[in-house]
Structures are given as structure tokens and as C-alpha cells.
Amino acid sequence: MKTLSPTGYGLLLVLPLLLAVLQSTTAHKNDINIYSLTVDSKVSSRFAHTVVTSRVVNKGSAVQEATFQMELPKKAFITNFSMIIDGVTYPGNIKEKAAAQEQYSAVARGESAGLVRATGRKTEQFQVAVSVAPAAKVTFELVYEELLARHLGVYELLLKIQPQQLVKHLQMDIHIFEPQGISFLETESTFMTNELAEALTISQNKTKAHIRFKPTLSQQQKSPEQQETVLDGNFIVRYDVNRTVTGGSIQIENGYFVHYFAPEVWSAIPKNVIFVIDTSGSMRGRKIQQTREALIKILGDLGSRDQFNLVSFSGEAPRRRAVAASAENVEEAKSYAAEIHAQGGTNINDAMLMAVQLLERANREELLPARSVTFIILLTDGDPTVGETNPSKIQKNVREAIDGQHSLFCLGFGFDVPYAFLEKMALENGGLARRIYEDSDSALQLEDFYQEVANPLLRLVAFEYPSNAVEEVTQDNFRLFFKGSELVVAGKLRDQSPDVLSAKVRGQLHMENVTFVMESRVAEQEAEFLSPKYIFHSFMERLWAYLTIQQLLAQTVSASDAEKKALEARALSLSLNYSFVTPLTSMVITKPEGQEQSQVAEKPVENGNRQGNTHSGHSSFQFHSVGDRTSRLTGGSSVDPVFSHRRGWKGQAQGFEKMSYLPPRLGPPGPLQPTRFSHPFSRITLDRVLPEVLSVPDETSHDMDSRIIGATIPPPPARIQAPSVILPLPGQSVDQLCVDLKHSQGPVKLLSDPGQGVEVTGHYEREKARFSWIEVTFKHPPLQVRASLEHIVVIRNRQSSAYKWKETLYSVMPGLKITMDKAGLLLLSSPNRVTIGLLSWDGPGKGLRLLLRDTDHFSSQISGTFGQFYQDVVWGPPAAADDSKRTVTVQGHDHSATRELKLDYQEGSPGKEISCWTVVL
């Protein structure tokens, strides 16, 4: 984490989506001490009001600078910030941006304050510094608000905690109040230990939930001997609400209403989707590889009633015909996607026009399903370089070609992409833009975006209210409604409005129109929000203002100059009236006399190729290459040189540019000398540390070490390997069994137990003797965990969350707990269930390993390659004098079992040697 100043303090708190960060900036943690830090977040009907309060004291003997640094979600609006120093409050004042800059420039001589900047995928960073006298105390308080959006069926609050020091009073409280009722609630943490879990309490009833985290000093410590904190990571709350057949809920508070609408009772409308893929040279390498992976997965998720096209462009856009998503066509398209290569220029204009032409031609020829929806998904990573390159002209061409008939979604890959250009083009055509961050999970980001739009349930959705009942209503017409999302409309009740607010929502299903009728009694709804414990005053009015401002700002992107001026004027007025820091306003922060008198906090706007100090949300690292051509080899390393049998080898193997390793010299100890050899070695294993650097012999070196010529090199002893799996067998004469897969290749069903509601499959690579991936699927809760050598992906409600191996994880949901420790052991457990473990094994036979615990919970329905050993297993008598061989009968089939030395991987690398009965399958 970045250090901002010689002294300071900190805590990173993220709540998306709620998010806040107070980060340590001190090299001397005892000087600036955080003695109290509290987070209070009240979520009332999806609208989150978060207050972060930090109290610090300067324990040093000199003046110290304390830097208050926080991260908050990009869609959140700061509403207040203040500092209390020696009993005097220094508030932040929100003003029009131009006026705030003028005030600041008068003090700072025109220098930019830079108090808020974009930092991550979903976050912005706020920071302010103040000098603190010895023994003086400072209280910082930041308030921000956000409407939580429903994403793939869940609302999410995320807290990222990194105090970097022990805090005497650390407390986080999250109150959730949902009048519709909370259907499920789950928590996840990347720092939680069993001891810390005792500081977490969750209470919940039908409509309310309270989550409190209040660790003691001892619970925060890494160990009793260390004064360092273990708090370093994420804490996440996910939930959803109950829904009626109508899918809607009208809620009223203090003269304002909000209407939530999310029906999920029909099958999806057939869709016709054109994927326009940038295959220009700038996409080569990791980008095009991840694009191929995502496309193959997305194609497999197409519905049988869907139609699709693939359009790639690389200087010229090749034409491809529209096809139905039949199994044959999907497999053909997957093969095509797997062969996509990056080369040439970026021809956005022609590729986009061709995509529209394909849809129009299919429509004219009546090839598209009746009343289906059509949209185009564009993925690109750079500016147009071939054909039409003027962004405004491309936008005009695309807008005229689409003519309101299709929806356009633009995905910008990386930070070199012209995001403002893509955003305007998408919004002008009924879609949206999304940035895809260059990272190990880029393919997952693409897949997740597709899942958001994969299931359109309604089209042309319109909300209607009596004109004598409401006014100043937010957007009430929507082109599409997708499964897992939510449409939100808010407004103001008229002074003489009826006692009952009625509403109609009209939309189109696949083959019919539908109208939803809802009513809400004003007095009853007002009574729902009387409890001050769970709501803050006039929250629904602020929700209405927040939503109105967000929509006005979105409209300015594609508006004409005259329209833009009017939209911005209204958004500015609301921002000032409700004290929101938006792209049109700034917060002027005053300081004590003698310090820099004021600073300005502004809302960053994502409208350029690169946003100043924007990063992907991960730390930056510097990589240094070694300049010399030698390598130091250490004990236990192994190298696999392959040398040509051809004559005339001149200091290097055929097909290799250079060689930087040689075998250890045979014979008595002595100084290491460069050696040459005249015959190939297929493998050389170095089992000791070589004290000198070995270099490649030059071309003129023809002397052979006499001790190597004619010497017999004994083969290295075979390493003890970890088996494919170790199966605990409770209640049998053999307490555990090692199973090696020697004859399997490709997907293997390892376990299937309908009684437990679990299935485990894996992909076995016979040549490498390892699993390349293992997938665990649970029926209740519906969840899938897919582990590869690189990372773990948890999929729930079509939403993917990726985790790196050896990251601490602690997730509790109804019916399942997921944990992972620093050793990389992932455990999936639940009462009265078999515990399934996954491990990325770094020892000999590197690869994924499966662990099983509590196997007595398997039902009589268990089956599979490994599961069969929990059904009707009979061990025969010893078949050898030394009791090293036995026969084991499994479901009537005999298998030979041999007692062998194996590495037990169950506690991680390096493993320990065990004697284990081994069966080869």
C-alpha cells in the first residue's frame, strides 16, 4: 500500500457498494496513533448513508503531519467532511466548481489540489493532510451516500480494512432495513481468523439486519508477541430482498416515493447478438488470449433460441453470416474464436456498420425470431486507425445506421482506449460502456458483463403514475430489463396527493404485452420508516436527488450543446441544494491558521484515455532484469536441456539461443570449471548448492574434463510423489487410501452425491500427471467453485468472484462456509456435510489436489472415480509375505493395492512421507 507521508495513520474501508479508506502513512506508528475508528453505515431501502469517524493523537514530541486518506465508490457522492482540532471544527463547504477553484487559486496560486482522484476499478481516493501539535487530538469525519445497484441478483456492501496498526476502539456497524424483507444475507472476509470471527455478530429478522465487527486489541494482533495488526483485507456483505409476483415495491417516506421493479417469473426473450471483436495488433498477447477464452465461454452460454454473429476486424472487417445458436453452430464458432489472432489496424467504423448490416439483412429476410431483442457488443482497446478515424464521424455513422433499432454495448479494454468516445456511442444507442481492466481476471470481467445482458426479460418498459399524485419523476422509460438487475424510479408526492399511490408498469414479453398494477397506501408506508435506528432523516428525498443527478449527468454525455447546458444547470442546482460533491461541484476544505488555508475536493470524471493516477486497483511493482548472462543454481533445482545429436554444436544447442546451465562436475570437490560434453543428457538434477556461477563455455573451448569422459552417471533416485488423491476411509480396515490416475485424460467425474447435493469434476492431464482444474458444484446453496492452477472462481447467481491462491478468505452463507488460509488450502464445509478441500500443491507432482474430510456424511448414492471407494469396499488378505500387496474389491471389481511411500499433501508443501496403500486407476 502506498505511503503518503513520513508520519500518519490509516484505515482502508470499502463499502460498495460502500467504500472508505483511511490508510496508514507513518514509518513511526507510535507518533500518530489512531485510538478510535468507527464506521456506521445505514442502508435503508438500498440507499446507503455511511459515516467514517477517526480520532487520532500525536504521541510524539514534535509537530507531525496526519494524512486522512479514504477510498469511496465512483458512484458515491461525498456529502460532508470535517476536522475537529483543539475543539474547533473546520468544515468542508460545497460550492460550484468554478467558484471553489477561484477561492482555492487565490491561496494556492493556481496549483491543483488533487484531493480526490480515481484509484481503482470502482473507487476514488480522497485525502487531506493536517499538522498536529504534540499531544494534540484530531477528529476526522467523512460522510458519503450511494444507491446500491442490484447486480446479477445481489446488492453488495464491501469493507476493506487495513489500519496498519492496532486500534484500541475499532467498531463497524452496518444496519440494513428492507421493507420488502431480506431473502438472504451472507458475509465474506479475506482477513478473518477463527479468533476474529468471535468479534463478528450478525442478527437478522424479516426486514432488518445488523452486522457488527468489534475486535479487541488482542484479537487484532498477529500473535501475542507481535504488535502488528492482522486486519488487512476485505469484508463483504451481500443480500437480496423478497419479491412478489408483480416484482415491484413502492415505498414512501416524508413526501417522496421510490418504486423498485424486478420481476423474475418468465423465460428470457430470444436475443440476436453481434460480437464485434478488435483483432488489431495492439490486442496481441494477453488481451487476445483472454478475449478468446471469454468468447468461448460466452458462446457456450447462448440460449437455443438465440442468434449470433462474430465480426472481427484487423484493418478490414471480414464478413460472416448470421447463425442460430445450435450446438453445431456454437461449436463451429468456438473453433473460430480459438483461432482469432491480433494483427493490423483498428477499423471500428466498418466493423460496426457491417454488424448493423447483418442484423438488418436478417430482419429483412425474416430470419430473426419474432419480437426478439437485438444488440451489438463491441470490444476494443484503442483509437480507430484504419478507414474512418474521426470519432465524431464514426459516432454519427453508427447512430444513423442503428436508428434506434438495436442496443449497443461498448467494452473498452485497458487504459489506452478512448473511453469517452465509446461511452457516448453506447449511450446514443440505448446501451452502456464498461471498462475492462487489464488483469488476470480480464476474461472473467468479459464473461460477467455478458451475464448482465444475457437474459432480457422485458423490453420497452414504461412506468405510469397519476398526474395528480406525483411530480418531478426520474427516468420512467427503459428499453430493456435484464434478469438479475432492477429498475428504479423515484419522485415527489404532490401536496394534495391521494391516500393511495397507484402505478402501472407496461412492457413486452416475448410473444405478448404485459401490465403490472401496484398500489401503496401512503400512511402505512410512511410508518415503515419511523424508526431512527435504521434510517436517517429524509433519506428518500436524498435518494431521489441522488438518482436525478446521476441520470442528468448520464444524459449530458450524448446531449447537444444547448441540451447539455440545461441538464448541467439542473444537476448543479440539486448538487448544491443537497450538498453532493459531483462533477459540477467542489468541496473547499479549510484548515487552521498558519497551515495551507484551503484545499479543494472534486469529483473525477472517467472521460479520457487515462485518468491521471488511475490504476487497476492493484499495487504497482517494478521489475528489474539481470544484465549478465549467467545464472546461479541452487540445490533442489532441476533443468531440462534438450541437445541436438547433430555434429558441429558450437557452444549452444540447436534451436536454443544460449545455455546458462551445466551439470555438476563429477569427482572430488574442487573449484568449478566450465565443462563440455559430447552426448545428450535428457535431464540433470542438481541436489546441492553450487557455490559459483556457471557460465556457458565459449566456442573455442574444446577440452573435455577427463573425469566426465567415459564416466557412468548414476540415475538420480526417484522422488517420492504425492498421489492424485488421498481418501480417508473411516470405519474400514485401512484408514486411508492413495489413488493414482494413470490412464485418465480430460474431464473426470470424481464425486457425485445427490444425497449431499454435491458433484466434483476435474480435468486430468495424463502427461503431466496432474489436474489442470477441479470444479465443485453445490445444489444448496446453488454455487460453483472452479479452481485452476492460477486462481479460484466462485460463481453464484451467474456472478463470478476470482481469488488468488494463498489469499485469506472467510465466507459464510446459508448452508455453506468457504475458507482459505495463507497456505492456500480452500475448504468448503457445512454441518452434516462432507468437507471438500482444494489445494494448489507446489511440491513434487505440482498441480491441484483434492482433500476430503467428514466422509462419513456421504450418502448411499455416492459415485464417481473417487466416490466409488465409499461404496461396498472389501479388503482381501495380504498377497505378499511382507504384507505389501492386497486386493481391494470395489462394487464387485478387484483392484491391486500396493503399500508405497507417498507424500502427504494435505498440510501443504513440502509434505511429509507416509506409507499408504495405493491403487492405480
Swiss-Prot record:
GO terms for molecular function: serine-type endopeptidase inhibitor activity. Belongs to the ITIH family. It comes from the Eukaryota. Liver specific. It is found in: Secreted. PANTHER family: INTER-ALPHA-TRYPSIN INHIBITOR HEAVY CHAIN FAMILY MEMBER (PTHR10338), INTER-ALPHA-TRYPSIN INHIBITOR HEAVY CHAIN H4 (PTHR10338:SF119). Disulfide bonds join C738-C916. One of its GO terms (cellular component) is extracellular region. This is Inter-alpha-trypsin inhibitor heavy chain H4. The keyword Signal applies. SUPFAM superfamilies: vWA-like. Appears to be both N- and O-glycosylated. Cleaved by plasma kallikrein to yield 55- and 25-kDa fragments. The keyword Signal applies. CDD domains: vWA_interalpha_trypsin_inhibitor. Residues 1-27 form the signal peptide. The gene is ITIH4. Residues 608-623 have a biased composition (Polar residues).
